[in-house]
């Protein structure tokens, strides 16, 4: 990251697949780098059961940080976490230790239908907010996104899976 001139501070979530050293031993250095870059926002770590204990052990190297480190342990074979603007789907993979893969999914709303908005006499000042999913009210009349949006469009899904044997998905 440093070679590319990228700061780690925009990172809000780090997901761990499993606890082999080649997948987790870089965490103390990353935490210290974030602290040295004056990060103050909390950092969320997601991983298999035991994550809290593993992170506490690694924090011996990085005991004092100017930001909070939160841990979420995956408790099921498949688990979904919802965040603003996307969801994270964790799924169990076939490895010799408890191991997960992750899919980040960004859904997309339907296209804005200008003709439907005009037919229903929806004020133009509300169009962009309705398109963003807001429900609005004016003079006792309620305007909802489904009044002006078409069918949901295909979204974006990026999957990361490592250290796994072939398996049915």
Residue ranges and their predicted role:
Residues 19, 49-50, 162-164:
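Active-site metal-binding loops of divalent metal-dependent hydrolases
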Residues 49, 75-76, 106-108:
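Non-catalytic surface loops within mature trypsin-like serine protease
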Residues 84-169:
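Active-site-proximal loop/helix segment associated with metal-binding centers of metalloenzymes
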Residues 64-67, 71-97:
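Charged mid-protein connector segments
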Residues 52-59, 74-76:
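A gly/proline- and charged-residue-enriched helix-loop-helix capping module
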Residues 1-46, 68-78:
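Active-site metal-binding motif and surrounding structural segment of the metallo-beta-lactamase
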Residues 23-26, 53-55, 169:
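Phosphate- and divalent-cation-binding pockets in alpha/beta enzyme and binding domains
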